Design a protein with these regions (language model features):
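Short, flexible active-site-proximal loops enriched in glycine and acidic residues
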Residues: 93-101
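Glycine-rich, positively charged N-terminal anion/phosphate-binding segment
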Residues: 1-5, 19-94
Length: 101
């Protein structure tokens, strides 16, 4: 069985990638109902999070029925990525994915 940290997945897991304007809570709910084993929120701008942008903050909404669920943050500034990772950690996702580049 594949394992990511303490998350144990089935042999052939069904994963939902972080997709902008697609993997929002209603879509994730549908995916979970249809067998998704691990899901990600939409990817979130690190700059948007540290500037308290409403659109970025809304993407932090995760719900217990979605677990395990991850959040991906993206950006190119080391300081912004560090600050935004602390914001993300506060909502307690099961995974944090870093897209730095």
């Amino acid at each position: 069985m594949p394992k990511i940290g303490n998350i144990i997945l089935p042999d052939f897991p069904l994963l939902l990638a972080p997709m902008e304007d697609v993997s929002d809570p209603p879509f994730r709910r549908l995916c979970k109902l249809h067998g998704a084993d691990l899901m990600y929120s939409e990817f979130i701008s690190s700059e948007g999070l540290i500037r308290d942008a409403m659109k970025s903050k809304q993407k932090l909404d995760i719900f217990d029925y979605e677990r395990p669920v991850g959040i991906q943050i993206f950006g190119g500034d080391e300081e912004a990525m560090e600050m935004s990772s602390r914001i993300v950690d506060a909502v307690q996702p099961d995974l944090v994915d870093i897209n730095f580049g």
